[in-house]
Swiss-Prot record:
Its EC number is 1.17.7.3. InterPro entries: Dihydropteroate_synth-like_sf, IspG_bac, IspG_bac-typ, NO2/SO3_Rdtase_4Fe4S_sf. Converts 2C-methyl-D-erythritol 2,4-cyclodiphosphate (ME-2,4cPP) into 1-hydroxy-2-methyl-2-(E)-butenyl 4-diphosphate. It catalyses: (2E)-4-hydroxy-3-methylbut-2-enyl diphosphate + oxidized [flavodoxin] + H2O + 2 H(+) = 2-C-methyl-D-erythritol 2,4-cyclic diphosphate + reduced [flavodoxin]. Belongs to the IspG family. Binds 1 [4Fe-4S] cluster. It comes from the Bacteria. Its cofactor is [4Fe-4S] cluster. GO terms for molecular function: 4 iron, 4 sulfur cluster binding; 4-hydroxy-3-methylbut-2-en-1-yl diphosphate synthase activity (ferredoxin); 4-hydroxy-3-methylbut-2-enyl-diphosphate synthase activity (flavodoxin); iron ion binding. This is 4-hydroxy-3-methylbut-2-en-1-yl diphosphate synthase (flavodoxin).
Length: 403
């Protein structure tokens, strides 16, 4: 048996995201202006931030702050809270003061809450021009208040609340209708000298959403907030968001994202962070490779992979672990990972850096992997092996007209 201890050697990086600060050979990020949401930059080449929204009653300050803490722990950069009532507006000062990440107030219907949110210390306010009463009249005042407070705004256009005139003109919430709504308000903001805003044009349909953002991206340099509205339950919404975001981010479109799921908000953040990690747009953390299992598997791969994932869920080092169930792909995949196991005949071969270091009984595989993985992760962190924070996509996108 090989008695050499691979952990004592400088550890090989595997699959770190490519540093895409250069323009070639991949598609560059779309050029956009930079705005600030509190201390978080959005646009202008800044790292793509992950957002979510609380589902508590905002007026319930302890519950809202608890959920914000959970979102922060999951990797959330910016949080949005709903403000449908006066009680919610009254809760904003304390929430903003105690939140560890920037708070955006989400305002519909009542423009008075916009001004209260600005006064409360919100880092930004989302306004929906489709349902705020007399928005054309109050818009300039909102811009002035935001300018005086030094905060940014988001023009949030949704298919479900599109202005009635635009709906009738374009025959529904088409890409052209959504973009027309966004441009109308963007030009109004800019006409009064306000430029610190980003835009979202959300639709529940993936194809329509992608077409809408492509069209909007060709019209100006505003930072774009990506989202598939009303995406659905966890599995369905995850698929929709990954398809839509993947298509756009691969073309350099998108400056901040929110995965909308009918699920606990922290799940939105986990999906968003992993999506960006896999596209090379966010520092990579722990990742697991596991086979789908088949008739050749001689171990319960599903249970084994789940146990390893759960045991390493809090690891932040960019360690990649392979859990394989047979000898067909097992040794090869395990050798390509930082740490891996190829299982069979009631035992598992443990690989580190492509070398077999030991063979253990099946009932010791999980504990062995967790122990070694934590040792490797600790060394990675001690050696300063942190993943590159990329600024562009890692796949070659399809060019499209107007971009």
């Amino acid at each position: 048996m090989n008695t050499e201890n691979p952990i004592e050697k400088p550890f090989r990086k595997t699959g770190d995201p490519v540093d895409l600060t250069s323009e070639s050979p991949l598609h560059p990020r779309r050029k956009s202006r930079r705005i600030m949401v509190g201390p978080v930059p959005v646009g202008g080449g800044a790292p793509i931030s992950v957002q979510s929204m609380t589902n508590t009653l905002t007026a319930n300050v302890p519950a809202t702050l608890q959920q914000i803490a959970e979102l922060t722990a999951a990797g959330c950069d910016i949080v949005r809270v709903a403000v449908p009532s006066q009680d919610d507006a009254d809760a904003l000062p304390e929430i903003c003061r105690k939140s560890p990440i920037p708070v955006i107030a989400d305002i519909h219907f009542q423009s008075k809450y916009v001004f209260q949110a600005i006064d409360a210390g919100c880092a930004a306010v989302r306004v929906n021009p489709g349902n705020i009463r007399k928005f054309d009249e109050v818009g300039p005042d909102i811009c002035k208040a935001a300018t005086d407070a030094g905060i940014s705004l988001r023009i949030g256009v949704n298919a479900g609340s599109l202005d009635k005139e635009l709906y009738a003109k374009y025959g529904g919430p088409t890409p052209e209708a959504l973009v027309a709504s966004a441009l109308k308000e963007a030009h109004m903001f800019e006409d009064v000298g306000f430029h610190d805003f980003k835009i979202s044009v959300k639709h529940h349909d993936v194809i329509t959403m992608v077409e809408t953002y492509r069209l909007l991206a060709s019209k100006g340099d505003w930072p774009l907030h990506l989202g598939v509205t009303e995406a659905g339950p966890a599995w369905q919404g995850t698929i929709k968001s990954c398809l839509a975001f993947g298509a756009l981010l691969a073309e350099g479109i998108g400056d901040t994202i929110r995965v909308s799921l009918s699920a606990p908000p922290a799940e939105e953040v986990k999906v968003g962070c992993k999506l960006l990690e896999y596209m090379g747009l966010r520092p990579r953390k722990f990742d697991i490779i596991s086979c789908p299992s088949c008739g050749r598997a001689q171990v319960d791969v599903i249970q084994l992979a789940s146990a390893v994932t759960e045991g390493l869920k809090d690891v932040t080092a960019p360690i990649r672990v392979a859990v394989m169930g047979c000898i067909v792909n097992g040794p090869g995949e395990a050798r390509e990972a930082d740490l891996g196991v190829a299982s069979g005949n009631g035992k598992g071969q443990i690989f580190i850096k492509g070398k077999v270091i030991k063979t253990v009984p099946e009932d010791q595989i999980v504990d062995t992997l967790l122990t070694i993985a934590n040792d490797i992760a600790a060394q990675m962190e001690a050696d300063g092996q942190v993943p590159v924070n990329s600024t562009g996509p890692v796949v070659v996108p399809i060019q499209h007209p107007g971009h």
